[in-house]
Structures are given as C-alpha cells and as structure tokens.
C-alpha cells in the first residue's frame, strides 16, 4: 500500500508524527502514516515554486497531454483506486467503481480539453495609438486542501483545473482518508515534471497551517467546513492570498402539490442518502406543500426504510458507514437534539446501529420547524428532515433563510413556477424535478457561507488564472 509523500518528483517517507488511518466499516486501523514535517512542507512548496517557472510557460497542449495520461492511468488502475477508497471511506465498492471513478477520469479529460480553449479576449484600440490585449495567466503555487467525503474526486476537482491553467500544486488530502491521493501521487510522479504536483499527508494544525501560510503559496483552494474556511481566511489574510472556498450546504428540496411524489420519494432516497449523506449537496431539507405533506411523509418513510445497509464489499449495499468515529458522534448528537423536541416525529431510523463500524441508520424526521437546528445546520449524514409549507412566498423565504447557499431543487409540473423560484433561490445550483446531478461542463459552487469560486466547467478553470492587461504603443 502506497503511503509515501510526493515531493519534487520523489516518493519519500514523512518525517513527522505518525497518524492512524482507519477502516470505518470495521473501526480497525489500516495502517499508520507519518505526517510531513515543516521542513518537508517547505521543500514541497519550494519545489512547486521552482517548477512553476517552466510549467507555467508550457503550451496548453503539453499540459493537456499530461492530464490525459493521468486520466488514462487512473482508468487503468480503477479497481485498485476503488478498493482503496472503499476501504478507507466505507463507501460501497460498486458505487466507487460505477459512479465515482468514471466521473474522476472525466474531470481530468474535460480540463485537458478546456486547457486548450482558454484564452484572453482579443481587444482593440481604446486609446489612440495603443492596442490593448487581455491575457489569462496562471497564478503560481496553489495549496489545495481536500476533504474526507470524496477524497479522490475532490482531489481531481482541485488538481485538474489548477494544473490545466499552468499552476503548480501542493495538495493535502484529509488525514482521515488519504490513501487514494497517495496512490495518485505514485502515478503522477512519472507523468508530471518534478515539483509540478506534490502530495503531503498530515493534520490541519501540523501540516495544513504551514502549507497555507507559506509565503510562496499564492492561492489556497479548500473544500471543507465553514469553520475550516474561516480559519484559513484568517490565517492567510496578512499575505492577501487568493482563495477558493467550497464550504458545505443544507440543500432545500421544495415539493409542490403538483409534483410526482413517487419520483420525489425515489429521488430523496438516492440523492439524500448517497455516500451515507456525506455530501454538501445532499437532498436533506425537504419542504412539502400542505396538500401532499402526509402522503409524501408516508412515501418517504417507506423509501428510506428500504435502504440496505451493509459491508462495502456487498454488491447489494446502498448505505455504508460514516467516515470516522468522531463524525458518527456528531451525527448522533444532532439527531438526539432533534428527537428531544416534542414536535419531531422519527419516521424511520434515528440512531446508530449495533455492531462494529461507524454505521448510522437512514433517518427521516417529520414535522421539523424552520427554526429547528435540524433544519438550519448541516448534519452531513444519512438524515433528512421534512417541513410543511403553505404557499410559494413562504417556502421561498424559508428556503433562503439559511447561511448556506450551495444547492437546491424544486419539484413541480408548473414550468412558470419552476422558473420563478429558480430565479429567486439564493443557491449556486437549482435543479428542477431532480437533484444532485453534476457534469464536468457545468459549474459547481455556492454563495453566502457556502463559499465562492467554481469547481468544474470553464468557470472553474478561469478561477485558477489571473486576468492581465497588455497595452502596446504604436
């Protein structure tokens, strides 16, 4: 099993404190990995800074060729990547193989093509005797911090656009789920020039702070919690670094009385509980119009209770464990707080399961109120609440009454209503009669405290570039 860091094109052992990496399906230790030392973090950043002088000047075609080689290599090693991700995260193996790996490969291939399409605007003469041009240039060294819910996919979302734009990257995966990023490092070292891509391991306070605070790092890209985002912004503010933040969500799912309730129930069953609900866009905050509320509660209860929990290796498993014991405790505490409210009804689930591993039963909580914590806070687990509403204005007000602004969906047969709400919902993405669906060509990112900047799409590529004005006198 690959456990070494990638620094300046060489795989090396960490020199810092050793940390245990767990299998969440069993609670057992997979292996121990040594963190990067401060000196190794410094070496990785300096290697990236040195490599940028040449990599930043390579042609888009040359960068695209490297990204395509990496995509091919991931595809060729798909089963090994899937097994590592499943073992380290507890994800059902078939979900990683069939859903995640193809999407990861596609992200690298998309940005390989996008790199060759990015250009500055050809301008003209805005001052007599002078011609202006616009360039889009790479930023420099990017520090990327990837989360533990989709370790390899989020690494791909960060690496592909940054490298395609001509930046050099030092990435730190979560210390909870580092195995696929470290495997990726072993493949990347034979594809990219030394220093272009560096992969470290360690905790935020020992490695992340040193990395993001390094004077040679010009941009920090984070997918994580609001608290982590706040910390990084405070930490990097004195150096005025560029930042790219995706900080979670609490997606409202608005169901009107003309919606297809069977489609809603099956949609929430999938989109609310995929990856054990550990997804920033999870369909977790349901608003149902009064006329269909009781019927939807019943249908959702039946759908959610039919989800099959099991071991990641079982092809029939739909719901795996949560990623860590600490997170299991957080999810349990959030549900217990909700259950303590006299008006909350537990339709199904509501507790962790017996036996080994960090499993929490798929949970549906009915009669939640707008002010309840279960409606306002991100649980990031297999927990969905449902709240009754009366009219369009009320539900729009409630849906926007959130510090989050990442994703939302509207379920209705009224096209006009769908357009009205999607125009007024304060979310980076609004789906109509579906949820959760993402493609490489379209941007993903939030507003409000869900952060700023876009992943995927040409907008994501542009986020990793600088706009520069060139003026020529003639």
From Swiss-Prot:
Q: Spell out the catalytic residues.
A: 246, 280 (nucleophile)
* EC number(s) recorded for this UniProt protein: 1.2.1.19, 1.2.1.-
Q: Where does NAD(+) bind?
A: 146-148, 172-175, 209, 225-228, 280
* Gene name, Swiss-Prot/TrEMBL: patD
Swiss-Prot/TrEMBL keywords: NAD, Oxidoreductase
**Keyword presence, NAD:** yes
Q: What is the name attached to this protein's record?
A: Gamma-aminobutyraldehyde dehydrogenase
Q: What else is known?
A: 4-aminobutanal can spontaneously cyclize to 1-pyrroline, and 5-aminopentanal to 1-piperideine.
UniProt xrefs under NCBIfam families: ABALDH, PRK13473.1
CDD domains, alphabetically?
ALDH_ABALDH-YdcW (cd07092)
Q: What is the lineage of its organism?
A: Bacteria, Pseudomonadati, Pseudomonadota, Gammaproteobacteria, Enterobacterales
Q: Name one Pfam family in it.
A: Aldedh
- GO BP, sorted A to Z: L-lysine catabolic process; putrescine catabolic process
| Keyword NAD on entry | yes
GO MF terms held by the record: aminobutyraldehyde dehydrogenase (NAD+) activity; NAD binding
HAMAP family membership: Aldedh_Prr
Which cysteine pairs make disulfide bonds?
Answer: none
Subunit organization: Homotetramer.
Quote the pathway field. Amine and polyamine degradation; putrescine degradation; 4-aminobutanoate from 4-aminobutanal: step 1/1; Amino-acid degradation
* Record family assignment: Belongs to the aldehyde dehydrogenase family. Gamma-aminobutyraldehyde dehydrogenase subfamily.
């Amino acid at each position: 099993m690959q456990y070494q860091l990638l620094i300046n094109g060489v795989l090396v052992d960490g020199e810092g404190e050793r940390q245990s990496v767990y299998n969440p399906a069993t609670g057992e230790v997979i292996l121990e990995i040594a963190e990067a030392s401060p000196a190794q973090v410094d070496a990785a950043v300096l290697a990236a800074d040195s490599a940028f002088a040449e990599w930043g000047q390579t042609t888009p075609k040359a960068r695209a060729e490297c990204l395509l080689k990496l995509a091919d290599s991931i595809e060729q090693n798909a089963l090994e990547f899937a097994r590592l991700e499943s073992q380290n995260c507890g994800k059902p193996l078939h979900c990683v193989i069939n859903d995640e790996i193809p999407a990861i490969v596609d992200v690298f291939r998309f940005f390989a093509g996008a790199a060759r399409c990015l250009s500055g605007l050809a301008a003209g003469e805005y001052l007599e005797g002078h011609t202006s041009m616009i360039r889009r240039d790479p930023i420099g060294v990017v520090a990327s911090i990837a989360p533990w819910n989709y370790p390899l996919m989020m690494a791909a979302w960060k690496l592909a656009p940054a490298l395609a734009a001509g930046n050099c990257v030092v990435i730190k995966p979560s210390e909870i789920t580092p195995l696929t990023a470290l495997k990726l490092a072993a493949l990347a070292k034979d594809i990219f020039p030394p220093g272009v891509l560096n992969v470290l391991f360690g905790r935020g306070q020992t490695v992340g702070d040193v990395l993001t605070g390094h004077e040679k790092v010009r941009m920090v890209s984070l997918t994580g919690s609001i608290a982590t985002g706040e910390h990084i912004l405070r930490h990097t503010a004195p150096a005025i670094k560029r930042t790219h933040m995706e900080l979670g969500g609490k997606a409202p799912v608005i169901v009107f009385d003309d919606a297809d309730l069977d489609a809603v129930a099956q949609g929430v069953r999938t989109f609310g509980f995929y990856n054990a609900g550990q997804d920033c866009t999870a369909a977790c905050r349901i608003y149902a119009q009064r006329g269909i509320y009781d019927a939807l509660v019943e249908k959702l209860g039946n759908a959610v209770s039919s989800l099959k929990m099991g071991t990641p290796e079982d092809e029939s498993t739909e719901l795996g464990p949560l990623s860590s014991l600490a997170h299991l405790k957080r999810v349990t505490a959030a549900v217990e707080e909700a259950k303590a409210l006299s008006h909350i009804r537990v339709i199904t689930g509501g507790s962790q399961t017996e036996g080994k591993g960090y499993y929490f039963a798929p949970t549906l909580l009915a009669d939640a109120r707008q002010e309840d914590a279960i409606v306002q806070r991100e649980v990031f687990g297999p927990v969905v609440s449902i709240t009754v509403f009366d009219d369009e204005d009320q539900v729009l007000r409630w849906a926007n009454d959130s510090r989050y602004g990442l994703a939302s969906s509207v379920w209705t047969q009224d096209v006009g209503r769908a357009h009205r709400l999607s125009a007024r919902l304060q979310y980076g993405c609004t789906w109509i009669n579906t949820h959760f669906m993402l493609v490489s060509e379209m941007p993903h990112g939030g507003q409000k405290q869900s952060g700023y900047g876009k992943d995927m799409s040409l907008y994501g590529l542009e986020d990793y570039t600088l706009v520069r004005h060139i003026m020529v006198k003639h």
